[in-house]
Every structure is written in C-alpha cells, then in structure tokens.
C-alpha cells in the first residue's frame, strides 16, 4: 500500500490509515477463527493501537464471552499472532509481550534446527521465519520505547 500523506508533512492521511487497519482487522479476525484462538458464531474485534501501515494491535473476542478477549497483532513488519488478554493491561504492554515472545520463539526455532539436522529442506524456511520473528521483535521493542506514538488516537 502506498503511503498517503497530507500536504502538511508526515501525518498519514486519516482515511488511508482507517482503510488500512480495517482491512487488516478483518484478516486478523479470520486468522483467529481459523487458528481456534477465538470461537463462536459471532466474533468482534476492536483496534486499540496502530503504527500506520506497519503494526495493528487489537482486542478480539467471541460475542458470547466479551470478557475473555485476546490481544492480536498484525502488520507489514510483524507476524499475525495473539496472546491472552490477561497478559497485558494495554496495547503497549501487549507489544512488549509480543516482542519478548518472538525473541524466545526464534531462539527455540534456532535450537531445534541445531539439535535436529535431519530437518533437511525445512531448515532454510525455519531460519527465515526465525529471522522474521527477530526483526519483528526488535522493531516492536523500539516502538515500545517511544512515548510519542502511544498517545495517538485511532481515526474513527
């Protein structure tokens, strides 16, 4: 997606941001249903924080169990993933949790490849995915360190 900016400078076009995160939110809901992270005939989701065209953090829940939400993350620079809602009080804490989780997942994958050389052709795919996890974790961690970007309101 081409980044659209207002004439005033670095502020992303609010309509473009809204279109971007709504499309991504639909994809997140489909993935959470497919993976079994949420279940039910009616699933709801609410975007909580976005870093435009890079990262979306949302709450996703079954309409029947609204108090049992999960934090979900998706975007250009990160994998689609989720954690239990109880693991973070807000989107920033969720981002920190995802960052740590992905570092640990990447380490575990690298260890698996070293311990099981018989994985053959899958080694390259595992290593590539591990690198993607680390890159996403590092990017997300850098974002959590920036005070300014956590105060923005989502475009309605």
Give residue spans per PLM region:
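N-terminal "first-domain core" detector
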Residues: 1-51
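Acidic, proline/glycine-rich low-complexity IDRs
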Residues: 2-5, 107, 111-156
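Short, charged/polar micro-motifs that form catalytic or ligand-binding hotspots
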Residues: 11-18, 81-89
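Hydrophobic, Leu/Ile/Phe/Ala-enriched alpha-helical segments that form helix-helix packing faces
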Residues: 24-36, 98, 102, 140, ...
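Short aromatic-glycine-(Arg/Gly/Cys) micro-motifs in beta-strand/loop hairpins
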Residues: 50-83
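Low-complexity, intrinsically disordered regions in eukaryotic regulatory proteins
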Residues: 73-81, 104, 108-116
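Compact, glycine/acidic-enriched structural inserts
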Residues: 88-109
């Amino acid at each position: 997606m081409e980044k659209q900016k207002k004439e005033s400078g670095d502020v992303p076009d609010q309509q473009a941001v809204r279109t971007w995160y709504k499309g991504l939110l639909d994809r997140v809901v489909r993935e959470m249903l497919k993976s079994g992270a949420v279940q039910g005939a009616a699933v709801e989701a609410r975007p909580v924080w976005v870093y435009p065209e890079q990262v979306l953090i949302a709450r996703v829940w079954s309409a029947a169990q609204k108090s049992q939400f999960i934090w979900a993350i998706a975007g250009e620079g990160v994998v689609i993933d989720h954690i239990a809602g109880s693991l973070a009080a807000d989107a920033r804490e969720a981002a920190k949790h995802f960052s740590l989780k992905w570092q640990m997942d990447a380490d575990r994958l690298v260890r698996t490849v070293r311990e099981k050389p018989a994985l053959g052709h899958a080694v390259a795919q595992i290593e590539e995915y591990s690198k993607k996890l680390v890159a996403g974790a590092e990017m997300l961690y850098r974002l959590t360190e920036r005070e300014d970007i956590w105060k923005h309101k989502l475009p309605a």
